[in-house]
Amino acid sequence: MKTKVTIKDIAREAGVSTALVSFVMTNLRGGKTAYRVNKETTAHILRVAKELDYQPNITARNLKYGKSGTIGVIFSDISNPFFSEIARYIEDESWQCGCSIMFGSTDESSEKLGKLVDVFISRGVDGLIIVPCEGPDEIIDSIIARNIPLVLIDRETSGYPGHSVVLNNARTAYELTYRLIAKGCRKIEMLSYTMSLTNIREREDGYRLAMQEAGLADEIIIGRLPHHDTDAHVDSIVKMAVERGADAFLFATNTLAVQGMSAIVRNGYSIPEDFEVACFDRNDAFDIFDVELVYVDQPAKSFAAESMKSISELIAGKVMNRTRIVLEPQIIEAGTFRSRI
């Protein structure tokens, strides 16, 4: 087994003191030292360190400065394509800034969120990026009270005073509804959740506004489904919409879109022949349908980049002018998904 190279080994090989090697390596910034040290001596020490394949003890260095070099990221459901894509990009960002990431999922459970927060804090994370779930705001409030750097993404808690990265949900839902109206649809029903999450409520607001401005206020209908038992209710919601003469559906999430379109097909209807469909987010499950729909491509890469930038600056103690970053999506119209089966 290869023996780990230490600072003493470098000092002995370079013919300098251990203190000088420690000083150079500790204050290294992008190949240069933060303080004035003879350039030739610095270059010599770094060359020897490279030849010996020296690997710094990141944990020890972080402990010295009170940092773990780890950021905790908590999603509502990391298996959701949108969140898993963000997770992938966050990993890429973490490599760029030289930190490690701990991931967790709450399954929309505030109890699980609380436990994950406690675990991550006990592990010494430097900061947290969280998709908050429905429930008491005490968990988020406690993080703020403990002065732990925090960034919320995708959604916020009521009255949250801190940093966040969110989508322009109301404007996006307005635009989706407007696209359906432009196709000639008048009885557009929205399928949403019973949860009082800020992003869901904002999407409902955007739908309402578009319908009202089009003179369709009397046609506004929002069917709300429980998050954990959607399949048991979606068929009845779709059937009632059909009985009311609905000609289009706006789905608040990609999961609802898959479940809703499945119910439409199960009941013998076609998209877009019988119903136009619009939804938030792309989902690979769309590939099993032979449909055309309007959907939102949320900027997962921007969510990752902006949240990592914000949390890194908070950890570094920088004063940030922007606390709430609102992202704009790309709307894909008439995207066609052909069946693979």
Listing of model-derived features with the role each one plays in the protein:
Residues 1-2, 6, 65-178, 182, ...:
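Alpha-helical recognition/docking segments in bacterial nutrient-uptake
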Residues 49, 94, 210-211, 264, ...:
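Conserved hydrophobic residues forming the short capping helix/wall of the S-adenosyl-L-methionine
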Residues 1-66, 338:
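N-terminal helix-turn-helix DNA-binding module of bacterial transcription factors
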Residues 176-216, 323-338:
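An alpha-beta-alpha
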Residues 18, 101, 150-151, 218, ...:
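Hydrophobic beta-strand scaffold residues
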Residues 165, 169, 219, 231, ...:
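Flexible loop/turn connectors
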